[in-house]
């Protein structure tokens, strides 16, 4: 407020307060003027319906009409938008009308579940004009819903509501087959499963089968309501246009003889359908489907014996394969050299000779050694150069048992030591050694793990047999005793 005294000057804050008060008073006056102008508008004034205050050109861009400064208030913004909007030209009106009329056509509504949902949601069938403006093809023409509403005034097929914000068809929307809405028609199939009609399944000469079927259906369903028509559909015949649309939805139509019973009221059709469900439940009888509802799902009967046999065979094969893999894995694991075996020590000078001797411990090599003097140890499939190159010596189960028996039994350990000392001096091809080995094999036939041939495997980490401190040394500047036979594999 301004002060009356001359001494006190109005400060800047007081002046700002005065100006704000004046501005607020001006805004109030403008609001009152606009309200009076709105009351004086006639009923036919299009500005009454096409209020610019909505601002948004489409639902996807709600902030478009609210851009700009806010200091002057929403009233000035409405005035600017009212001045910006202009009625569309004739060409744009025609394009908008054609496009939206296509949206509401039967051809499009049958496929467009989204728009059909909005049509069914409103009891009067109205759809928002702003929603239609947000559609892709309409948005290419205009983004202002007021332009769309103005163009729809010129449509003959569509009509706007009182406030020009919603639109609907002038004709009612029919019931489409893809909708799960009950209709007045009842599809009856498996006719001749009825006890009163099964005798008519055989062709008769008088040709009155169809008439008797219709009489039975009229008598059966007439108790639920007034029947407008009964039609018999036979396979291979041309279907009526209204039934042709649902032929792809219901497999019974066109494939077997069935009947279409149409009632005058939807409630009567629903009652008849419920009655047929209770009658056909748990027994063979003719069945009925209410047109518009989901068709019954056919569940094929599964033969349990047929299904269980391949399943059991598959499980058996899997278990056998798994067992074979386990045995192979165990065999590979037992045949592979461990880090504690002397064969795995690459620094040992005796590794090559021991590896060659190990090849003779295989069953095939062992049999060839005694049965055929001229047999070569290379005939064994386990003594191939590839196996030697990989450093993997496949040992028979006798070898594994021999290792355990030699280490656990003192007597067997002594025998192993005797034969190891003999074989280190005597050539493996000596007849005396063969006879001695054959005698030992005969006496200990029941315990093959005590074979003297396996004693070479019982060695320490230095490459020496168990119980041997060092190998004998020969004279100086020589290769030791029996140097000419060192190149041969010792047993």
From Swiss-Prot:
Motif position, Nuclear localization signal: 296-302
One record GO biological process: regulation of translation
Residues modified to Phosphoserine: 56, 58
Keywords: Acetylation, Cytoplasm, Nucleus, Phosphoprotein, RNA-binding, Translation regulation
Annotated SUPFAM superfamilies: RNA-binding domain, RBD, Winged helix' DNA-binding domain
Region of interest called Disordered, as start-end residue ranges on this chain: 1-87, 293-403, 423-491
Domain RRM: 184-296
Single Gene Ontology MF annotation: myosin binding
Keyword Nucleus: yes
Listed InterPro entries: La_dom_prot, La_HTH, LARP6_RRM, Lupus_La, Nucleotide-bd_a/b_plait_sf, RBD_domain_sf, SUZ-C, WH-like_DNA-bd_sf
Chief location: cytoplasm
Biased composition (Acidic residues): 24-37
Compositionally biased region (Low complexity): 332-346
Subunit structure: Interacts (via the HTH domain) with VIM/vimentin. Interacts (via C-terminus) with non-muscle myosin MYH10. Interacts (via C-terminus) with DHX9.
PANTHER family named in the record: LA-RELATED PROTEIN 6, LUPUS LA PROTEIN-RELATED
Function: Regulates the coordinated translation of type I collagen alpha-1 and alpha-2 mRNAs, CO1A1 and CO1A2. Stabilizes mRNAs through high-affinity binding of a stem-loop structure in their 5' UTR. This regulation requires VIM and MYH10 filaments, and the helicase DHX9.
Protein name stated in the entry: La-related protein 6
Source organism of the structure: Homo sapiens (Human)
């Amino acid at each position: 407020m301004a002060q009356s005294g001359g001494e006190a000057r109005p400060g800047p804050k007081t002046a700002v307060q005065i100006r704000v008060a004046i501005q607020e008073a001006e805004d109030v006056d403008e609001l009152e003027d606009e309200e009076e102008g709105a009351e004086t508008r006639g009923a036919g004034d299009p500005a009454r319906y096409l209020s610019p205050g909505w601002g948004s050109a489409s639902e996807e861009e709600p902030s478009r009409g609210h851009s700009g400064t806010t200091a002057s208030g929403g009233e000035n913004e409405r005035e600017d938008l009212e001045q910006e909007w202009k009625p569309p030209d004739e060409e744009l009106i025609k394009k908008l009308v054609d496009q939206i009329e296509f949206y509401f056509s039967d051809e499009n509504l049958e496929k467009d579940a989204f728009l059909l949902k909005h049509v069914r949601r409103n009891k009067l069938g109205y759809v928002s004009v702003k929603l239609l403006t947000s559609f892709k093809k309409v948005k290419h023409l205009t983004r202002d819903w007021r332009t769309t509403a103005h163009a729809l005034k010129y449509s003959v097929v569509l009509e706007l509501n009182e406030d020009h914000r919603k639109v609907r068809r002038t004709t009612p929307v029919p019931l489409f087959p893809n909708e799960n809405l009950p209709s007045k028609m009842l599809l009856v199939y498996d006719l001749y499963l009825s006890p009163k009609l099964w005798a008519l399944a055989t062709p008769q000469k008088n040709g009155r089968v169809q008439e008797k079927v219709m009489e039975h259906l009229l008598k059966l369903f007439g108790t639920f309501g007034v029947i407008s028509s009964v039609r018999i559909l036979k396979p291979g015949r041309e279907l009526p246009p209204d039934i042709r649309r649902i032929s792809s939805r219901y497999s019974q139509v066109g494939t077997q003889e069935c009947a279409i019973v149409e009632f005058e009221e939807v409630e009567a059709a629903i009652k008849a359908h419920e009655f047929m469900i209770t009658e056909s439940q748990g027994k063979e009888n003719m069945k009925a489907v209410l047109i518009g509802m989901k068709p019954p799902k056919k569940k094929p009967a599964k033969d349990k014996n047929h299904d269980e046999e391949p399943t059991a065979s598959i499980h058996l094969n899997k278990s056998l394969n798994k067992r074979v893999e386990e045995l192979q894995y165990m065999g590979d694991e037992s045949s592979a050299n461990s880090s504690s075996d002397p064969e795995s020590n690459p620094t040992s000078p005796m590794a090559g000779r021991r590896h060659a001797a190990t090849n003779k411990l295989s069953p095939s090599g062992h049999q060839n050694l005694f049965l055929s003097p001229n047999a070569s140890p290379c005939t064994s499939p386990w003594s191939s150069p590839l196996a030697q190159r990989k450093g993997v010596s496949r040992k028979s189960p006798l070898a594994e048992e021999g290792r355990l028996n030699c280490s656990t039994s003192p007597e067997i350990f002594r025998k192993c030591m005797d034969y190891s000392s003999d074989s280190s001096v005597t050539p493996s091809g000596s007849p005396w050694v063969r006879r001695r080995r054959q005698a030992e094999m005969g006496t200990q036939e029941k315990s093959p793990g005590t074979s003297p041939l396996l004693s070479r495997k019982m060695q320490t980490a230095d490459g020496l047999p168990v119980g041997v401190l060092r190998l004998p040394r020969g004279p100086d500047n020589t290769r030791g005793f029996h140097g000419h036979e060192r190149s041969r594999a010792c047993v």
